[in-house]
Amino acid sequence: LKICQITTLGGMKRSLVNMTKKALNKLVKLLALETLEENLFRGQSENIGGPRVFGGQVIGQALTAAARTVPEKRFAHSLHAYFLRPGDMEYPIIYNVERTRDGGSFTTRRVVAIQKGEPIFDMALSFHKKEKGPSHQIDMSNIPGPKECISDMDIKKKIIERIPAKHRDFFLRERPIEMRHLPGESMFDEPTNQLPYKHVWMKAAGKLPDEVLQHQAILAYASDMGLLSTSMLPHKLSYAKGNVMSASLDHAMWFHRPFRADEWMLYSTDSPSASNARGFNRGSVYTEDGILVASAVQEGLMRMLKK
């Protein structure tokens, strides 16, 4: 048995080839959605090895559905969502868009995602036309650039043996988003007593067209990757350790300035509070030259598991 285990793990290490471009193409198709009729869209889910549909996928698809009903040259500036039920990867998701308001400058939409006749997700979005006004931002943290950080895949190769078998497919899957972590800040690292702060560089794994919606939808997808794990850091909780069960409860996001999701962005996250089995997390997204382009906030359930 021991020999078989070593052989299997060794084979897994050899098979961890960077297939992220292929995964990105799958994500782009996943976010495209099928139009059923006016205000009604259908999306598919990809089995990523986890127990349920990835929340970032539903956020990105709901954003796409809403944007399809909005006048040209109006782009999402904020979204606020609740995860109501776990999504089933074996069934399509129906997105029903409610045209709440079409104003002179702003457009408001509500999207309900439905599976098996029940809502699994509810999101309100606001779209705004380009407008002149005052501008300021908080500066980006002074941290190493993406070339000086550790890739997601390199971290996984080192810790395959430590990832619980039931989580391996999920964590070793092909990812459409390239990620580079500061040493000791990956959600795969061994749990230690850490402050609830984290920084990760991320970008789409290939070139994208110039369509604003596609870049926003992909960043919305990526914003749910690892955000909740920030609140686990001070408590020695880790997916790699298998000592926590977690789920996103809600998600809010603001798009401040134009950006490209296929260029490096810094995702700086912090967790001001955790209580009553819920972790509260915030994220700021910067371009490589320090421009603040988006912000995200999420509260998530995190239950400690006894071994």
Question: What is each of the regions a protein language model found here?
Answer:
Residues 13-307:
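Terminal targeting signals and extreme-terminal segments of soluble enzymes
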